[in-house]
Curated annotation (Swiss-Prot):
Residues 86-108 are annotated as: Disordered. Pfam families: NifZ. One of its GO terms (biological process) is nitrogen fixation. The keyword Coiled coil does not apply. Belongs to the NifZ family. Keywords: Nitrogen fixation, Plasmid. This is Putative NifZ protein. The lineage of its organism: Bacteria, Pseudomonadati, Pseudomonadota, Alphaproteobacteria, Hyphomicrobiales. InterPro entries: Nitrogenase_MoFe_mat_NifZ. The keyword Protein biosynthesis does not apply.
Length: 108
């Protein structure tokens, strides 16, 4: 009997986002207790916020974790692939630009 995984192993493929890439949050992110100086449950990132990928790491030898700098908030938060979408080469973040596509099907 084999044990199935709930989600595919992301690290078998290259990362979807690279350092320096502009990204947008596809959902609200709250502190799960791993972000220092903030209360558990406190909102760290809002859906539609724009930021830049600073680094790419892995978690549980299964998922990519992207260290994203949220310029407007002045914080860096670890994000999963499904919580982000690329803003490509756009020069300045706009709320409407970030929000576009957030509720259109599944997050990347």
């Amino acid at each position: 009997m084999s044990i199935g995984r709930e989600e595919e192993v992301e690290i078998h493929n290259p990362p979807r986002f690279m350092p320096g890439e502009r990204v947008c949050a596809t959902r609200h992110i709250k502190n799960d207790g791993t972000y220092p100086g903030k209360e558990i449950g406190e909102r760290l990132v809002r859906k539609g916020d724009a930021g830049f990928v600073r680094d790419v790491g892995t978690f549980l030898q299964q998922f990519y974790i992207y260290a994203v700098e949220w310029i407007d908030r002045g914080i860096v938060v670890g994000m999963r692939t499904r919580e982000l979408r690329s803003l490509g080469g756009t020069s300045t973040p706009k709320t409407t630009e970030c929000a576009r596509g957030v509720n259109e099907g599944k997050a990347r």
